């Protein structure tokens, strides 16, 4: 394929590729903005990036978790409401199943010692492959039951086997849905400490709609006063002995038709749960539109920063500084070429912009990808490299060069690195040059934010 020219009017179209239709895209975007305004902070899908977990090491209260904590993730659902043949927990975002994101939200915390994932027997091998591929080191996979409560009970029983030293009994166990990947450490800490003190705890959210009861003839019977009620959410925490005993004592009817773990602890052990207000990001991926919203949140989180690498030419350095100003919506660092192999810079972000002002070898791309592999930087999330080539004189596209770039992009894509190219012609006309610089910033931002795999290997021309 030849050089692709992208007009400014196309940028909005590229940005919406993750949504099924423009109307739905606008609705989801408004929903994300609502999350942002309610929390009064940047959108945060549960500290998805590993460096966030490292920064959290100094958070107040961490030291008080001096007892073993484990998690049980029921993941045996069929995803009927999603309307897909693949269960929703195994639907992929960036070629990575949703359940892997949820597992990481727990694994990244050093005070969580074990994550038991409960899956249907038919999905056992699939889950084991996910654990191996994404290097989940704290996970034990067990078979689920025919209902949600039976699956949770199976997960809890994994800790009761005294002969299995690899799964020691925890003091506190957290039960969480496999399709709620956006759970933050702060909430998990509150749930854990409240469970240790009270015996049981759970996250709640305000009701967004009024709940009504209907008659058998489908007439209104009565409605509940919304202000008095809350929606029960996940995660929920328990002293292990309490919740395990509750499941041992509960009836077959509870196991078959029940859905609320807090109710079992209250009814069969007399333990009244402490309820904790959760953030708006606790929502559950249930429908196709939720999967699109989850992808949008992950993209937003991965796009907060970038590293601009400038080659030695004066023109490249100046272009790097200008691009940094135009990318003011992101945190950016400008470093000279040669330092990109420094782990300090590689581990800070998953977005890299390489600027050259003369014909240069593409070997640096392979060297950079090798560095990513050495620090396991691209296993969980795709890394973006935007190669900006500044031409001081207008040149026509070279088909051999274009083919080589596409082949290189295809090679590194197998290692979860997304390579894009942008050619920008320098103009002596100030107004035209300013327009080109503006388009360069806009296209670069879109490529980083959208992470569209279909555009890898394309050399865009501004």
UniProtKB/Swiss-Prot annotation:
Residues the UniProt record annotates as site (Positions substrate for the nucleophilic attack): 226, 284
Catalytic activity: D-ribitol 5-phosphate + CTP + H(+) = CDP-L-ribitol + diphosphate; D-ribose 5-phosphate + CTP + H(+) = CDP-D-ribose + diphosphate; D-ribulose 5-phosphate + CTP + H(+) = CDP-D-ribulose + diphosphate
Traits of the deletion mutant: Hydrocephalus and incomplete brain folding by 48 hours post fertilization (h.p.f.), as well as significantly reduced eye size reminiscent of microphthalmia in patients suffering of muscular dystrophy-dystroglycanopathy congenital with brain and eye anomalies in human.
UniProt-annotated location(s): Cytoplasm, Cytosol
Entry's Gene Ontology cellular component terms: cytosol
Pfam families listed in its UniProt record: IspD, ISPD_C
The UniProt record lists the keyword Nucleotidyltransferase: yes
Enzyme class: transferase
Annotated site (Transition state stabilizer): 81, 88
Entry GO MF terms: cytidylyltransferase activity; D-ribitol-5-phosphate cytidylyltransferase activity; protein homodimerization activity
Keyword terms, alphabetized: Cytoplasm, Nucleotidyltransferase, Transferase
The enzyme's E.C. designation: 2.7.7.40
InterPro entries: IspD/TarI, ISPD_C, ISPD_synthase_CS, Nucleotide-diphossugar_trans
GO BP, one annotated term: muscle cell development
Listed pathway(s): Protein modification; protein glycosylation
Keyword presence, Metal-binding: no
Similarity field: Belongs to the IspD/TarI cytidylyltransferase family. IspD subfamily.
Subunit relationships: Homodimer.
Entry function: Cytidylyltransferase required for protein O-linked mannosylation. Catalyzes the formation of CDP-ribitol nucleotide sugar from D-ribitol 5-phosphate. CDP-ribitol is a substrate of FKTN during the biosynthesis of the phosphorylated O-mannosyl trisaccharide (N-acetylgalactosamine-beta-3-N-acetylglucosamine-beta-4-(phosphate-6-)mannose), a carbohydrate structure present in alpha-dystroglycan (DAG1), which is required for binding laminin G-like domain-containing extracellular proteins with high affinity.
Name this protein carries in UniProt: D-ribitol-5-phosphate cytidylyltransferase
Taxonomic source organism: Danio rerio (Zebrafish)
């Amino acid at each position: 394929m030849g050089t692709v020219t992208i007009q400014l009017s196309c940028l909005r179209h590229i940005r919406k590729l993750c949504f099924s239709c423009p109307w739905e895209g606008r609705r989801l975007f408004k929903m994300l903005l609502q999350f942002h305004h309610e929390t009064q902070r940047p959108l945060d899908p549960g500290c998805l990036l590993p460096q966030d977990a490292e920064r959290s090491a100094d958070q107040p209260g961490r030291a008080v978790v001096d007892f073993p904590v484990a998690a049980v993730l029921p993941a045996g659902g069929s995803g009927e409401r999603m309307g897909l043949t693949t269960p929703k927990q195994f639907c992929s975002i960036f070629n990575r199943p949703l359940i892997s994101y949820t597992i990481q939200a727990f694994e990244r915390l050093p005070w969580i010692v074990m994550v038991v994932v409960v899956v249907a027997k038919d999905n056992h091998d699939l889950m084991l492959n996910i654990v191996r591929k994404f290097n989940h080191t704290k996970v034990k996979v067990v078979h689920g039951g025919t209902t949600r409560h039976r699956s949770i009970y199976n997960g809890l029983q994994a800790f009761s086997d005294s002969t299995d030293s690899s799964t020691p009994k925890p003091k506190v166990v957290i039960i969480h849905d496999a399709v709620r990947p956006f759970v933050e450490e702060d909430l998990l800490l509150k749930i854990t400490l409240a469970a240790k003190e009270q015996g049981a705890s759970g996250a709640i959210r305000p009701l967004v709609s009024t709940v009504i009861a209907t008659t058998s003839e489908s007439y209104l019977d009565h409605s509940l006063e919304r202000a008095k009620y809350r929606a029960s959410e996940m995660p929920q925490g328990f002293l292990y002995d309490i919740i395990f005993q509750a499941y041992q004592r509960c009836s077959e009817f509870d196991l078959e038709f029940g859905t609320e773990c807090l109710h079992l602890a209250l009814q069969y052990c007399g333990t009244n749960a402490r309820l904790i207000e959760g953030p708006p990001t606790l929502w559950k991926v249930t429908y196709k539109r939720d999967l699109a919203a989850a992808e949008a949140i992950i993209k937003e989180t991965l796009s907060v920063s970038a590293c601009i690498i400038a080659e030695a030419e004066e023109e490249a350095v100046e272009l790097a500084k200008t691009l940094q100003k135009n990318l003011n919506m992101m945190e950016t660092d400008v470093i000279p070429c040669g330092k990109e192999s420094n782990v300090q810079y590689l581990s800070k972000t998953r977005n890299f912009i390489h600027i050259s002002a003369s014909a240069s070898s593409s070997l640096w791309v392979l060297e950079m990808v090798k560095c990513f592999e050495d620090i396991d930087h691209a296993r969980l999330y795709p890394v973006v490299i935007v190669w900006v080539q500044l031409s001081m004189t207008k040149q026509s596209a070279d088909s051999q060069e274009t083919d080589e770039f596409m082949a290189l992009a295809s090679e590194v894509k197998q290692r979860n690195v997304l390579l894009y190219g942008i050619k920008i012609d320098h103009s002596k006309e100030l107004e035209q040059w300013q327009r080109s610089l503006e388009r360069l910033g806009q296209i670069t931002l879109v490529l980083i934010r959208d992470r569209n795999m279909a555009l890898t290997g394309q050399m865009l021309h501004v």
